[in-house]
Amino acid sequence: TLFPYTTLFRSDYLKFEKTLISLNGKVLNKGAVFTLIKSNVDTKLYKENIFISQNIFMNITKANEKERKIIEIDNKPARLRYAELLGISPSQIENATLKNPIGRKIGDSIYISSIAGIEGDTLNMYAQVFENTKVEILKAQSALDIQKQTINQINSDFKEIYGIFCINCILRFLQFEAEGNLQELSKGLKSIGEYGGFVSYGEQFNKQHLNQTLTMLVFGRKK
C-alpha cells in the first residue's frame, strides 16, 4: 500500500435496492468516487471491531468467490457445518449470525466477513471470501469496553485532535441500537473530538474488504 486509505460501500437505508453517489452534479448508481487528501496536520487510520477469536476454526472448501457465497465448510454443507461448530441447530442460525461473524486473521488483525443470509445450505456473505482459506467463527465482546480501548489508543497517539472522519458498518449500528447503547457509544466518540462520517454496507481498510467494523481517519497533532 502506497498510502493508508479507507472507503465505504454506500447504504440505501436498508432497502437493499440501489445506492447513489454524486460527483460534481453527476449521479451514478454504479460507480465509485475517490478523494485524495493532502493534509498539513498529522493523520492516522484506525479500525475497531468488537469481535474476538473463540478458537472455532474451519476451512472454506467450496466457495463462489465472485458472488461471495460459502458453499462448503470442512467438506460439509456450509449451513450445517456452521451450526455444528457453534453447537446450535440449523434453525437457530439466523439468530446467531450477527454476533458470530466469520473472521480471517492477517498478522495480528482480524478482518470480518458478515453473513448476509442463508440460501439453502449456502452462506451468502457481505464481504469477499476465498476458497481454500482458513477462517474462524468469532464472538462479540462489550462494545463499550472495546470503545474505551480505542479511545485510549487514539489519545496515546495524539496530543491534539482536530477532527475524525468515521465509516461505521450498518450492522454495528443496528446491533448497538437493539442493545440500547448507541447514544452512549456516540458520546464516547465525541469525547475525543468532533467527528462525522457515513453508515456503510461494507468497509475497506487499506487492501482489506470487511464488515461490522468502524474505520476512523483521525486528524491532529501526534505526540
PLM-predicted stretches and their roles:
Residues T6-K223:
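Hydrophobic alpha/beta core scaffold segments
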Residues T1-Y5:
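Short, exposed "boundary/linker" segments that immediately precede the start
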